[in-house]
């Protein structure tokens, strides 16, 4: 049966791929409520985020999505329609407000009966919920596995292959429901990388898929997730992206150099850039990271190639990403606890000593290295061949 499901999904893939590319030609950029607000998020917070995206210059930099994560749901009405809770008195009005700013709005659910925060999920109401999202004017859906894992285990105890088949089918079901609405809605799969999702995510309509467990605002969490993306570059491209989770930049528990590493690595990975901080309370330092035009251009490069690891020696890693104009983005990462010098491996990258170099975080430095890379830090370069 699993083989039959995959065969049918692959037959439909050309159509799905075309629709996916239109929605997500480059990785999504925007904001998500979870990392800062968690289940406390309100209508007021979302409106404030939309205002801040415009006022701060983030909209002009490409941050378009304003995404509500978990905890917006109330119960269902007598007809089975999902109803927002009291924190969100009028979801259509909220969507209209976000759209009036020239932005897009996203929402969250689960294929299970409950979300991770124990709010109402979409289980057995997929078509109904998709229609409601479209009626409200939603442009993005994050679909989080959560309690559907219990459904899988109960239906097929000890049979992991069957459980994964059910997971694929659950995501495919919502994808078809979204397509049936006629509204272009970005479909974000959140299932923590299970069953090598990068191999099957496109066939169930995913525009992006989480490759690991949730990120936390710590260097250990961020770096373990980010550097674990090595080897996944061939699975990403226009319309379908590996997602190492949302940004923690500006949430305050990492150092400046660590946030530079975070932003640099996510850009090389062509990852979705979804800010997760309180946008109404951003420091100048946080803005300088999130609004850096060069790092955003690396992430959003229209070639659509995810970067990958070039070398790893002890705590030192070098990653590169090809760009459409022939340039190469290169990150020199120091995962160690002391500042150390690092150099460009010119020959390994197909470069010469005459290659022109732009230092993204230190534009006044036009040298060819070596560079002193701080503890947990990065030197991010754009190199012209």
PLM regions and their residue ranges:
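Catalytic cores of secreted or luminal carbohydrate-active enzymes
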Residues: 261-310
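C-terminal beta-strand-rich structural cap/linker in extracellular carbohydrate-active enzymes
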Residues: 367-385
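Carbohydrate-binding surface patches
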Residues: 266-269, 274-276, 312-351
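Glycan-recognition surfaces
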Residues: 183-278
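Bacterial Sec-dependent N-terminal signal peptides
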Residues: 1-20
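N-terminal module-boundary/linker segments of secreted carbohydrate-active enzymes
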Residues: 20-47, 52
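Aromatic-lined carbohydrate-binding/catalytic grooves of carbohydrate-active enzymes
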Residues: 49, 53-159
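Structural recognition of the beta-strand scaffold that forms the well-ordered cores
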Residues: 27-33, 62-68, 104-109, 139-144, ...
């Amino acid at each position: 049966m699993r083989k039959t499901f995959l065969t049918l999904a692959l037959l439909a893939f050309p159509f799905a791929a075309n629709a996916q590319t239109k929605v997500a030609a480059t990785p999504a950029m925007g904001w998500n409520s979870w990392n800062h607000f968690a289940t406390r998020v309100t209508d007021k917070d979302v409106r404030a985020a939309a205002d801040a995206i415009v006022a701060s210059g983030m909209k002009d930099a490409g941050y378009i999505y304003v995404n509500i994560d978990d905890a917006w749901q109330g119960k269902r009405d007598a007809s089975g329609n999902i109803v927002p809770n009291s924190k969100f008195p009028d979801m259509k009005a909220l969507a209209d407000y976000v759209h009036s700013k020239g932005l897009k709005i996203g929402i969250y659910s689960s294929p299970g009966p409950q979300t991770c925060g124990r709010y109402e999920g979409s289980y057995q109401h997929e078509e109904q919920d998709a229609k409601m999202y479209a009626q409200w004017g939603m442009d993005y859906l994050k679909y989080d596995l959560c309690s559907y894992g219990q459904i899988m285990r109960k239906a097929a105890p000890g049979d992991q292959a069957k459980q994964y088949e059910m997971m694929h089918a659950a995501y495919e079901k919502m994808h078809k429901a979204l397509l049936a609405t006629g509204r272009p809605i970005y479909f974000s799969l959140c299932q923590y990388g299970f069953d090598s999702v990068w191999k099957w995510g496109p066939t169930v309509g995913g525009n992006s898929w989480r490759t690991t467990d949730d990120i936390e605002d710590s260097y250990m969490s961020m770096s373990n997730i980010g550097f674990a993306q090595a080897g996944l570059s061939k699975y990403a491209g226009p319309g379908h992206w590996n997602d190492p989770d949302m940004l923690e930049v500006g949430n305050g528990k990492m150092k400046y150099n660590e946030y530079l590493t975070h932003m640099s690595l996510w850009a090389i990975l062509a990852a979705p850039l979804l800010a997760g901080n309180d946008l109404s309370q951003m420091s100048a330092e946080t803005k300088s990271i999130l609004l850096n035009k060069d790092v955003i251009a690396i992430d959003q490069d229209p070639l659509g190639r995810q970067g990958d690891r070039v070398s790893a020696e002890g705590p030192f890693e070098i990653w590169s990403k090809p760009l459409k104009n022939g340039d190469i983005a290169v990150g020199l990462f120091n995962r160690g606890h002391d500042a150390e010098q690092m150099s460009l491996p010119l020959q390994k990258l197909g470069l010469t000593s005459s290659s022109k170099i732009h230092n993204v975080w230190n534009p006044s430095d036009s040298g060819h290295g070596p560079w002193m890379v701080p503890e947990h830090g990065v030197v991010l370069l754009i190199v012209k061949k």
